[in-house]
Amino acid sequence: MERKALEQKLTGFFEELHMHPELSYEEYETTERIKRELAAAGIEILQIPLKTGVTAIVRGAKPGKTYGLRCDIDALPIAEETDLPYKSKTPGKMHACGHDFHTAAVFGAALLLQERKEELQGTVKILFQPAEESSHGAETVLETGVFSDVTAIFGLHTAAYLPVGTLGIRAGSVMAAVDRFESVSYTHL
């Protein structure tokens, strides 16, 4: 797919997701929209026993390891107060954390992987994870066993503090989570 065509496709996909946000474990339309787009691109969808979320797979023509690529698809219970032409049409819900962008970016990666699968060494499982904003979305996906053969899973998150075109990479945890803890330490001098 030509760059301009891909950009237009992903922009439209992003805007549709942004206009129709769904909360954790309620991502039914989002799930169906993702499935339709993946199927239209000839990308295989794995059947997993979850009501929302999608796992797809691109099998490379060459043998190799299996990797995962992950994004989150749920929105937040926040009213959107913008005048964007693609602002949320769902009262009290919006993609305030960038999950619409994450989904569009990973969908774009899936399209490119599918387009180049003859050159691909190994397999890529692509997770459109439900319920990231709750504390159990990843856990429910992992419990299905669909990622038991994966060597590593790569995820992404927008970062407004980085300049456009910059990629930030770090081993270990990078961002906050929905579970919180408090740590107190004492020292003796």
Model-identified regions with their sequence ranges:
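Acidic/His- and Gly-rich active-site-bordering loop/insert found
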Residues: E2-H95, A104-F107, L111-L120
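Short Gly/Pro-enriched turn/cap motifs at secondary-structure boundaries
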Residues: L46-Q47, E132, A171-A176
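Structural motif
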Residues: I48, C97, L127-Q129
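Beta-strand secondary-structure signal
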Residues: T55, G68-R70, K125, R180-V184
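Acidic/histidine-rich catalytic neighborhood of metal-dependent amide-processing enzymes
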Residues: F101-A171
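Short, solvent-exposed loop/turn segments at the edges of secondary structure
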Residues: D149, A176-R180
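Conserved small/polar residues in nucleotide/adenosyl-binding loops
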Residues: T187-H188
